[in-house]
Every structure is written in C-alpha cells, then in structure tokens.
Amino acid sequence: MSAGQRFAFAICILEISLLRAGPTPSYDPAERQGTPLPIDCRMSSWSEWSKCDPCLKQMFRSRSIEIFGQFNGRKCVDAVGDRQQCVPTEACEDPEEGCGNDFQCGTGRCIKNRLLCNEDNDCGDYSDEDNCEQDPRPPCRNRVVEESELARTAGFGINILGMDPLSTPFDNQYYNGLCDRVWDGNTLTYYRRPWNVASLTYDTKADKNFRTENHEESIQILRTIIEEKKLNFNAGLSVKYTPVEAIEKNKCVDLEHSDKGSTSSPSKLAAEAKFRFTYSKDDIYRLLSSYSAKQEKMFLHVKGKVHLGRFVMRSRDVMLQTTFLDSINTLPTTYEKGEYFAFLETYGTHYSSSGSLGGLYELIYVLDKKSMEQKDIELRDVQRCLGFDLDLSLKVGVEVTGNFDSKLCSKKGMGQTETNPEADLFDDVITFIRGGTRKYATELKEKLLRGARMINVTDFVNWAASLNHAPVLISQKLVPIYDLIPVKMKDAHLKKQNLERAIEDYINEFSVRKCQPCQNGGTVVLLDGECVCSCPKEFKGVACEIKK
C-alpha cells in the first residue's frame, strides 16, 4: 500500500457537531436540596441472542443506556452491542460474483481492461499493474500534475453527535484513466482531479476581519459554539466523541492534532497548572464547564477562517473503498443495534456531497476581570494588543499578513508572558483549531507550555501558511451515509432501511434526556457518556447547588 493510500485511509476530519433542542429543565432556587448523590451509569439487561446468521456465522445481542453517569458518578463507556461466533443451521445464499468481461482485482473490484498497466492504482492494491509486458500508458503522459490534498479529503463524513469518523467511504485516488487537471493560482500548481470529485475549484480567501465576541459566562460560549456548528437534528446538548462499539480493526491518525491521550477527568483538570495545551474535544468542553465555578472571569472568543477551495462529489457511479463495501456486506440483514452503531461510528452518519475546504482558527481567552480593572485595561485594548482587531490581507501562496501592537501591550502592562510572569491578565487560552500541519501544532504547543498566554495574530499567520498541506472541511452539504449503498448489492434495501433506523436510534440512545436536571438555572450537557452541569455565574457545584 502506498503512502498516499495510507493517508486516504487514515485521514480524520475534526468536525464537531453539537446539537441543541429545547431549553434544559432546571430546579427553582427555592427547591435546592444540597449536593446530590452521585449517579452511576445504568444500562438495561442484555437482549436474547439473535439467530445465528448463516453468512456471517455470528449471533448478536444488544442493550440500552437507561441513565447516564452524573454528579461524579460512573460514566457510560461500555458498548451497547455484543457478538459471538456460532454454527449456523441454515445455508448461506452467496451472491453471484464475477466481473464478466472486465478485470477482477485482487480486492474484488471490477475495472475496465483499458485501465490495466497505466501506472495508476485503479484496483486499490496495484493488482492491475501486475503482469504488464508492454510499456505503461500513463493517462497524464508527460504533463506535470500533483495529487490534490483538497480532493483527497473531499466527501469525508461527519457524525451528528460530534465524533470523528474513523474512515472515509470514497476512494479518491481512483481516476478512471482520466487526467483532468485543475489549476491552483495560489501554489502555481496543476492538480489531478479524482473520478469521485465532479468539480474542484481553488479559490483562496480569508476573512478580512477576525470575529471577536466577549461573554461573562462560559455557558454563553458553549451555546455560541453549538449554535454555529449544530445541524438540524433533534439531538439536544449531546456530544459523543469516543467510539465504544466493535470497531477493533480501525485506527485513526488525527490530522487536527487531537491529543486523545491527554483527556482528563474534571477533578484532574481542576488540579492541573494553568496554560494547558489541548486540541482534545473532551478537554475543551470540560474546561469551559469548569470555569462556570470561578468568579470574576471574562471570555474573549476569537475566530478566523481561511477558505482554499470548493468541491462537488459525483452523484452516480462513484468508486467506493473496498473496506467500506466489505463493512456493508458484513452488516446483518436483521436490525442489530450494536453492529449498525459501529458502522456509523466508523464511517459517519452522513457524508459531504459538496463543501468548502480550508481551516478554522478559534481561540478562547479567559481574562481576569479584577486584573483588568486594576490596570485600567478595557476589552478593546486586549483585542488591539493581540492584533485581532486588524484587517487581514491574503497573498499568493496562502500568505496572510497582520500585525499586533507590541507597544500598546507594554504600555498597558500586557507584555509577553514568556518573559513577564507577573502579567496575570490572561488566565488561560483554550485552542480550538481545525486544519494545518502537525509542525505548526507542535510549535504552538511548545509556546503555550512555556507559559505564553498571548497567542496573537502572528500565530494565525503561521498557521494559515500550513493549510495547503492539511486542509479540512469548513462547510458542507450533508447526505445520509446509507445513500452510498450500491443498489445492486445483496440485501441493499434491507440494510439501507436498517441504517436509516440506526441513525434515529443513535440520537435517542445518546440523548441528554437521560440526564437529571441541574439546579438554579444550570444547563446540563451530555459529554461522552457523562452528564455535566454548566452553571450560571452566581452558582457552582456539580449540580449548580452552591451559591458563590
């Protein structure tokens, strides 16, 4: 397998989709009963084992989540599905196989004979390039052309509860013998358009201004993120980012630098030193929730975007990954919740039929209001010091320029904190960045670990320069994943119906309705199997039961 293939299989797109329904119920302050007892995760009993599937030689059972862990109780991390081997009592009706007059690859894929010996990996395993006695006939001949990172990420899916899909259904390194070149005026390069991508357009632009918002409460930022990233699904404030079903053969290389190993519990986060570095969704949302218990804080929310290009996927005759087709074939024809949930967690609940690629740059500064008052610093001063009130200019090669006012920073006592540990204006900075290379992420991580709290517009410029090498989806039109099931596949109609049902059950299984309400106007959020209360600024505690 080539490095490009490994990249296509491993790429993960960090698309957080937080979904909000109606208002969260809460206790009246007069009904406050004190700190509630911990609630442990409670699951139903296992169902009976299913009949032995004659083709899969497996049988299945499932269970449901009745109550999620809350108030420091045990969270729900166990699978809802189970399987075991069995000896079938019925014969398996194998579908007719074969490619007729076409060439059958080692992967089982059928391709036209004209695609043999052309130096392209049309089979996915290079078996079409074996036994070539004549000179190869490359489609692009002597024309200079590069593989497009934008095209290779096109079509990648999302999970409506926010988890990153572990694989893509599309084989975007299949070209069907064509050499369709697309010119990128920014990198001055011709890129080859894959067969699955009907349209690929390079059009680089950046937001002229940063968007900045300030909030008095952390829940306001959480709601802002939800409103901007939610989809029109009735899923409530529920987020799930850890797969727990049977997907043992899939592994993910996270191109957006999500450090899964750094996930921490709320108690551990509270005990850690300031200025932590994280791209982990777990840490981001738990950190925002933890600040609801602290007084005299203000939150500056900074957002910037760079758009590199657009794509539209082909609507018919797409070339799907062999692993995706194998996964569909191994789905049982009877509805087994655990198996279908596992499929959704592997490939996503939806895929992108069209969209934009680039990067999103988002920072949340936690400011100390008392320190600002003592130094006579206003929010506008902070924005000017960091450079986030300036217009940006974009040049060829995705070069973004901008400057920050270092003289103003020094005058106001907001000097660079790597050399000025007394500058306690910035309590923390929480990064929420999508796109860009690992090299940039490492540099930013090292800067934050040295104690630098003033991540400024220069850091944005450095990040933007790396986007050509690692773009991500920044907007997309979504289509249910079951629409990709080939109509000629055995039991296609049954499995499509089962997947449609599974998406609805998936939302209901991981629903915030299985949480207990918070007290005193607190908002309950379901974070990866645990219900967490985000409190108004006047209250704190696991249930917002304590008045500050």
From Swiss-Prot:
It holds the Pfam family Ldl_recept_a. It comes from the Eukaryota. It is found in: Secreted; Target cell membrane. GO terms for cellular component: extracellular space; membrane attack complex; other organism cell membrane; plasma membrane. Keywords: Complement alternate pathway, Complement pathway, Cytolysis, Disulfide bond, EGF-like domain, Glycoprotein, Immunity, Innate immunity, Membrane, Membrane attack complex, Secreted, Signal, Target cell membrane, Target membrane, Transmembrane, Transmembrane beta strand. Membrane attack complex (MAC) assembly is inhibited by CD59, thereby protecting self-cells from damage during complement activation. CD59 acts by preventing incorporation of the multiple copies of C9 required for complete formation of the osmolytic pore. MAC assembly is also inhibited by clusterin (CLU) chaperones that inhibit polymerization of C9. One of its GO terms (biological process) is complement activation. It is a multi-pass membrane protein. Residues 1-21 form the signal peptide. Residues 40-93 form the TSP type-1 domain. Belongs to the complement C6/C7/C8/C9 family. Pore-forming component of the membrane attack complex (MAC), a multiprotein complex activated by the complement cascade, which inserts into a target cell membrane and forms a pore, leading to target cell membrane rupture and cell lysis. The MAC is initiated by proteolytic cleavage of C5 into complement C5b in response to the classical, alternative, lectin and GZMK complement pathways. The complement pathways consist in a cascade of proteins that leads to phagocytosis and breakdown of pathogens and signaling that strengthens the adaptive immune system. This is Complement component C9. The gene is C9.
